[in-house]
Amino acid sequence: MHDLVIRNGLCFINGEFVECSVGVDGNRITHVAKEVERGEIEIDAAGCLVMPGCFNAHTHAAMTLLRGYAEGLPLREWLEKVWEVEARLDEDAVYWGTMLACVEMLKSGVTAFADMYIHMDAVAEAVGESGMRAVLGYGMADRGDEERARKELEIGLEFAEKWNGGFEGRVTTMLAPHAPYTCSPEFLKVVSDASKDKGFLKHIHVSETLWEVKEVRERYGKRPVEFLDSIGFLDSSTVLAHAVWLSEAEMKILAERGVSVAHCPTSNLKLSSGIAKVSELLEMGVNVGIGTDGAASNNMLSVLSDARVGALLQNLRGRTLKPGHWLEMATEGGYRAYNLKGGRIEEGYLADIVVFSKTCRNAPMHDPAAMLYVENQALHAVVDGVLVMEDGILVNVEEEKVIEKAEETALELVGG
């Protein structure tokens, strides 16, 4: 008998949807077939879509507190407004903001996310309580100050070492310097060395705007990716957020170094940043995941919604990709970027699985993959082999309480 069985669903496997059942034991998928033996827990998925959970490859979860704040501004002006409010954040605020994000993500089919922010102990606690999976790092920026650099690295390393493997392995950690324009070359080198010494991943914002490209070129005489490569920062343990404004030479560097990209199409549109060359990156062999960025720069944390926006933008560029490719980026692309064996309905993979029902919004299903773009409220969610949402109701979290506490916190934060 299996620990858990998802039975008779239409399962997303190798880019297509096929009828099958999924057996889970411990935190792994152990059996994928038309017929599997009974499970201690049985989920009837007849008429439903079953797919690996989505991985939000770049976000700042607690920024749900700033959803709808500083609307209508380009990135630099938006950052100035947001940083002013973020300076008032404390552990309690970040906890409730992250809990709200976890509720939203689970209900939209996201089982795991990568987060770089502040007060990260609170983020880790929220992840643990919600039942989600996450890769977490303290967002570091030295701004050319040696003393600040020392303190930032100390905080980042302390957090990474404390929480790596937390909550039975659902939390893993990384080092997360903010960007080439907020971190000095010396600091980035130290972070890169620490990453190699300790075995931590690295995550950084890169080439989000043309302003950033211009700023880095003026400082260092190189484009951002070329600059990072020149100091030895780029390798297969590196994930770049955004990567909108890349030259062909830079894309080749990413492919050669095994760097992954977290594509954030909605955020890039909202902040007037630009449209990333996703099709070209994939053609060159670069692994791409999909991120929402924070709710303040997106308004939602639905990876499937971002996949839809990303697909439409590449269509606009004349570089169309099939819906199945976008689902692969939304799932396995993120897990692969962060060195996790997940994002596939396949034996031996992490049992992070979501189930979507058929509704008036996604019927008829001529192409189930395309229909997931428009119907992205999950019915059931399994993370690490554990049922964390059943019939749309979260198992570990009081949703109404989280919404109430997050709203109270947000109003206090912005002085409402």
Swiss-Prot record:
Enzyme Commission number, as recorded: 3.5.4.28, 3.5.4.31
EC class name: hydrolase
Catalytic activity of the protein: S-adenosyl-L-homocysteine + H2O + H(+) = S-inosyl-L-homocysteine + NH4(+); S-methyl-5'-thioadenosine + H2O + H(+) = S-methyl-5'-thioinosine + NH4(+)
Any Pfam family hit: Amidohydro_1
Gene3D superfamilies on file: Metal-dependent hydrolases, Urease, subunit C, domain 1
Residue positions binding substrate: 86, 178, 208, 293
Domain of life: Archaea
Cofactor: how and how many bound: Binds 1 zinc ion per subunit.
UniProt xrefs under SUPFAM superfamilies: Composite domain of metallo-dependent hydrolases, Metallo-dependent hydrolases
Keywords: Hydrolase, Metal-binding, Zinc
Primary role: Catalyzes the deamination of 5-methylthioadenosine and S-adenosyl-L-homocysteine into 5-methylthioinosine and S-inosyl-L-homocysteine, respectively. Is also able to deaminate adenosine.
PANTHER family assigned to the protein according to its UniProt record, in alphabetical order: AMIDOHYDROLASE-RELATED DOMAIN-CONTAINING PROTEIN (PTHR43794:SF11), AMINOHYDROLASE SSNA-RELATED (PTHR43794)
HAMAP family: MTA_SAH_deamin (MF_01281)
Protein name: 5-methylthioadenosine/S-adenosylhomocysteine deaminase 2
